[in-house]
Amino acid sequence: MSAPTANRSASGVFSPTRAHIQQRTLRTDRWWMSPLRIDLGFAAFVIYATARAFQRDYFFFPKYHYLTPFYSPCLSKACGDASDFWPQILPNVWWLPFAALSLPFLLLFRLTCYYYRGAYYRTVWQSPTACAVAEPRVHYTGETRFPLIVQNTHRYFFYVAGIISVINSYDAIVAFHSDDGPGGFGFGLGNVIMVVNVIMLWVYTLSCHSCRHVTGGRLKNFSKHPVRYWIWTQVSKLNTRHKLYAWITLGTLMLTDFYIMLVASGAIPDLRFIG
């Protein structure tokens, strides 16, 4: 990342002798379409996730133990059967989501993610909006001031996200228990959706730049650490598609929650294959 403008010499694009161009950009293509699509995608997820987190209903289907990821782990005293494994330590107040201890960390993990940072820097703060498009502001401070300096905490939120992914995996495993299945085992479309969501959450988390640094960072000689080197190469392969996984997981989270909401509300029955 380039240095703040206050530390740059008056040369290059900052040279006083550089030609002054009145137009913000000379690009003739629809460069604004990509930022617009990203803004709409972010807005759709934020609105949906916020509405569902505060709806406080249709988040758990006890017959098949389906629990939406937006309410996991469910720690409120109003969670009922959804928190059999977890202590109900949160008060039942309307302004506090049932998963209030995990949602902030997941939000901060995504907000500080390298891809998401680059995305909303362009679309929300327009810094820059697009290649060869001038920024609307004159001064650039980078990630040296509050609140952007908080971006450096991403490496710590990575560990919390890993713990929450373990919890989501537990939820997906428990959902294979059915009250009607042979030996208590059941398998339906909801299980498929939950497992796919968990797999994609793991792929997104493990493809994180912080994970790449954890596995291979600070190694001066890879040949002396063949296991870590192999893990680093695999994480690096995943890392090349981190942007794709970031968007896929937003979709799988919404799909999983929406499907469980429909089943829990009685709008549709779960398509069962076994039990």
Which stretches of residues belong to each language-model region?
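Membrane-embedded alpha-helical bundles that constitute the cytochrome b-like, heme-associated redox core
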Residues: 1-275
